[in-house]
């Protein structure tokens, strides 16, 4: 069994990497990938905490996080396709120009 501190440190590192990618990148695809990393880091923290205390709640929250990530990915990819069709780019700065 993985100690609680090691699992939470790994989850924090993954969350920080995802947040860094989300803030630095301007490409919508990379931003979606970074957001997926952040969601998976939070789900990992739930699973680690649940396994330490012998509860199944962490695994239930993981299933909820995976379903949330699937919904987020489908909506994000639909927006990505529309942005690529209309502007022929994936730069997030052009989204503000799509109003209208």
Swiss-Prot record:
Q: Which InterPro entries match?
A: NADH_UbQ_OxRdtase_chain4L/K, NUOK/Mnh_C1-like
Q: Does the keyword Transmembrane helix apply?
A: yes
Listed GO MF terms: NADH:ubiquinone reductase (non-electrogenic) activity; quinone binding
Q: What is its EC number?
A: 7.1.1.-
Determine if Kinase is one of this entry's keywords. Answer: no
EC top class, as a word: translocase
- Report membrane topology: Multi-pass membrane protein
Q: Which GO terms describe its cellular component?
A: NADH dehydrogenase complex; plasma membrane
Which Gene3D superfamilies does the annotation name?
1.10.287.3510
What reactions does this protein catalyze? a quinone + NADH + 5 H(+)(in) = a quinol + NAD(+) + 4 H(+)(out)
Q: Which keywords are on file for this protein?
A: Cell inner membrane, Cell membrane, Membrane, NAD, Quinone, Translocase, Transmembrane, Transmembrane helix, Transport, Ubiquinone
Pfam families of this UniProt entry? Oxidored_q2
Q: Which GO terms describe its biological process?
A: ATP synthesis coupled electron transport
Q: Which residues cross the membrane?
A: 4-24, 28-48, 60-80
Where is the protein situated, by its record's location annotation?
A: Cell inner membrane
Q: What does this protein do?
A: NDH-1 shuttles electrons from NADH, via FMN and iron-sulfur (Fe-S) centers, to quinones in the respiratory chain. The immediate electron acceptor for the enzyme in this species is believed to be ubiquinone. Couples the redox reaction to proton translocation (for every two electrons transferred, four hydrogen ions are translocated across the cytoplasmic membrane), and thus conserves the redox energy in a proton gradient.
Q: How does it assemble?
A: NDH-1 is composed of 13 different subunits. Subunits NuoA, H, J, K, L, M, N constitute the membrane sector of the complex.
Family in the record: Belongs to the complex I subunit 4L family.
Instruction: Give the protein's recorded name.
Output: NADH-quinone oxidoreductase subunit K
């Amino acid at each position: 069994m993985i100690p609680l501190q090691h699992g939470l440190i790994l989850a924090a590192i993954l969350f920080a990497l995802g947040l860094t990618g989300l803030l630095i990148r301007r490409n919508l695809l990379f931003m979606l990938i970074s957001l997926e990393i952040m969601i998976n880091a939070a789900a990992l923290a739930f699973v680690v905490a649940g396994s330490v205390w012998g509860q199944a709640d962490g695994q239930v929250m993981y299933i909820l996080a995976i379903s949330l990530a699937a919904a987020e990915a489908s909506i994000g990819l639909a927006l990505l396709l529309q942005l690529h069709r209309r502007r022929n780019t994936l730069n997030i700065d052009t989204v503000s120009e799509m109003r209208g």
